[in-house]
Amino acid sequence: MTPLTLALDVMGGDFGPAVTVPAALQALNSDPHLHLLLVGDPDAITPLLARADFEQRSRLQIIAAESVIASDVRPSQAVRNSRGSSMRIALELVKEGRAQACISAGNTGALMGLAKLLLKPVDGIERPALVTVLPHQQKGKTVVLDLGANVDCDSTMLAQFAIMGSVMAEEALGIENPRVALLNIGEEETKGLDSIRDAAALLKTVPSLNYIGYLEANELLTGKTDVLVCDGFVGNVTLKTMEGVVRMFLSLLKSQGEGKKRSWWWLLLKRWLQKSLSRRFSHLNPDQYNGACLLGLRGTVIKSHGAANQRAFAVAIEQAVQAVQRQVPQRIAARLESVLPKSD
């Protein structure tokens, strides 16, 4: 297999190198063909590589960065002052062809702005969208976008997201003629914001799209659609609410009845139920699907949760590997040519 090189913004996220560097070593252990460029402060990175063996170090390179983009800085300010930052350098490595993808847990708005500036959107796309693939109760997967890259979206942007999501479901997940729905407050055609209703009218005119109408948030994990489209504000709130509920549920499975004296048979039954339910619902654990792809760019960019732990950030690295191997940006660009007008 051909070696694959990824650029990691090691300094991004709530925990910085303390999480991203161990996750990088974990990813190297899992993939012998993977090479990583660790972009950040060498003084912060080097001590965390003490446990890396010679073989791992041979597939690692530290790229020095002078600064870190703060999580609370405005995107426009972040882009203006981004030179020398770990996020910008990681994206520049992709632009220069030294890396095939970039992964960052940093400021979402800054990542969006810099990626659009440096890597450029594909023809016909106004703005990229953050997309992830969520598991549902049918043991299948649903493509969901936008998850926060664009807080305010008009109908044209929502229609473009729908087309990109449909292409990703078909090309990356192998779903033939994927069903596409708009997230709304009801299934009736008269409900929702003007932008959603106008987007619905647009999607009905796209012959290559299997548009099925509106879907409500309580049906997100039911498997009723293969692609779910919304603006970034709604998508981000929906995703984080779902993740919070799932984490609480999984936590309750582990802690139920702790601290109380129980008979041996009750404890045995409890342990069996916990294991059974944990296996049944483990595929919903947010750590297992961390990493949202910034879809619609000419290169591959993966946004990790800022609060991701080591396991979750390693999953984001794996998401980048899969996106590159499947040539997601190239396939999307090729498919969009037939359904979207060229930008001037």
Swiss-Prot record:
Pathway: Lipid metabolism; phospholipid metabolism. Its main location: cytoplasm. One of its GO terms (cellular component) is cytoplasm. It holds the Pfam family FA_synthesis. The keyword Lipid metabolism applies. Homodimer. Probably interacts with PlsY. Keywords: Cytoplasm, Lipid biosynthesis, Lipid metabolism, Phospholipid biosynthesis, Phospholipid metabolism, Transferase. Belongs to the PlsX family. It is found in: Cytoplasm. GO terms for molecular function: phosphate:acyl-[acyl carrier protein] acyltransferase activity. The keyword Lipid metabolism applies. It comes from the Bacteria. This is Phosphate acyltransferase. GO terms for biological process: fatty acid biosynthetic process; phospholipid biosynthetic process. The gene is plsX. Catalyzes the reversible formation of acyl-phosphate (acyl-PO(4)) from acyl-[acyl-carrier-protein] (acyl-ACP). This enzyme utilizes acyl-ACP as fatty acyl donor, but not acyl-CoA. It is an enzyme of class 2 (transferase). Its EC number is 2.3.1.274. It catalyses: a fatty acyl-[ACP] + phosphate = an acyl phosphate + holo-[ACP].
